[in-house]
Amino acid sequence: MALRWGIVSVGLISSDFTAVLQTLPRSEHQVVAVAARDLSRAKEVAEKHDIPKAYGSYEELAKDPNVEVAYIGTQHPQHKAAVMLCLAAGEAVLCEKPMGVNVAEVREMVAEARSRDLFLMEAIWTRFFPASEALRSVLAQGTLGDLRVARAEFGKNLTHIPRAIDWAQAGGALLDIGIYCVQFISMVFGGQKPEKISVVGRRHETGVDDTVTVLLQYPGEVHGSFTCSITAQLSNTASVSGTKGMAQLLNPCWCPTELVVKGEHKEFPLPPVPKDCNFDNGAGMSYEAKHVRECLRKGMKESPVIPLSESELLADILEEVRKAIGVTFPQDKR
């Protein structure tokens, strides 16, 4: 039976997700509604993608009984309101990362989903790429021996994108791209809470974080480190090393198609890319969509691959790091 999706917001990421859903079998996934704050934009997207319903408000989509799961692709500060709206209406939710601007927001959304017994997942698409799944298998099999250290880098000059440097939109490197580095290290070390976090970094002139390097000490004397930046080009790779070797996700590590394990190079080709995709390897969004359907058809309320407790942990780490270099957002004062 097809999973019936409602798309909240018509920005670039929502556009890609919608296009990718259209490439999947209609017997499994259907986009039944799209909402924007401007009805004409919603109608435009509905026409382009052959979506039956277009709404000029998120409230209307939340009330649509035909929508089974809502995909939230709004700007970071609008995630919480949209998620709460859809949960209150009884819809399951897949929310773009970062789920919230800070950990308090994430905890509120998680509590709401649990109190209503509804499915909620943070759309950390990286986890569902076959290359990431292959890496998890390598780790589970002990191929690398006793783990010692994990390292991730994600940086490119994003200053031409207004949202990326906009303090009011919770811009900056950490929430936009640093989350990919944190989730990688967290995945490697099994979602444990770090014992100690050390941070160095610089702020952008607009008040958001610019370039940040973080060291995370974990139980068992293992550690991870990452650097993220919205002004500097970095290697955009992620690696984990143990007593028997190293594994590395090659660039682009946030949507990986290549994994090197102890010198052996493996490729994981993506499905065909829909036309008009805005982001690199956009076709890879299909993996998380399939996972959501699988979870919902099994009656699950959260994903075992990115559980809600880990979404809370990631938000907690990112907030601590952000505040360590003196970046606070309006949401922190509520």
Curated annotation (Swiss-Prot):
One Pfam family, short name: GFO_IDH_MocA_C3
Describe the reaction catalysed, as an equation: (1R,2R)-1,2-dihydrobenzene-1,2-diol + NADP(+) = catechol + NADPH + H(+); D-xylose + NADP(+) = D-xylono-1,5-lactone + NADPH + H(+)
Q: Name one GO molecular function term.
A: trans-1,2-dihydrobenzene-1,2-diol dehydrogenase activity
Q: Which gene encodes it?
A: DHDH
Site annotation (May play an important role in coenzyme binding): which residues?
Y71, H79, K97
Q: What is the superkingdom listed in this entry's lineage? A: Eukaryota
Q: Where is this site: May play an important role in catalytic activity?
A: Y180
The protein's matches in InterPro entries, at most eight in alphabetical order, are given as: Gfo/Idh/MocA-like_OxRdtase_N, Gfo/Idh/MocA_domain, GFO_IDH_MocA-like_dom, NAD(P)-bd_dom_sf
Family note:
Belongs to the Gfo/Idh/MocA family.
Site annotation May play an important role for the adaptation of the alcohol substrate into the binding site: residues: D176
Tell whether NADP is among the UniProt keywords.
Answer: yes
Stated EC number for the protein is 1.3.1.20, 1.1.1.179
Subunit info? Homodimer.
Protein name per its UniProtKB record: Trans-1,2-dihydrobenzene-1,2-diol dehydrogenase
Q: Which GO terms describe its biological process?
A: D-xylose catabolic process
- Please provide the record's keywords in A-Z order: NADP, Oxidoreductase
Q: Secretion signal: which residues?
A: none
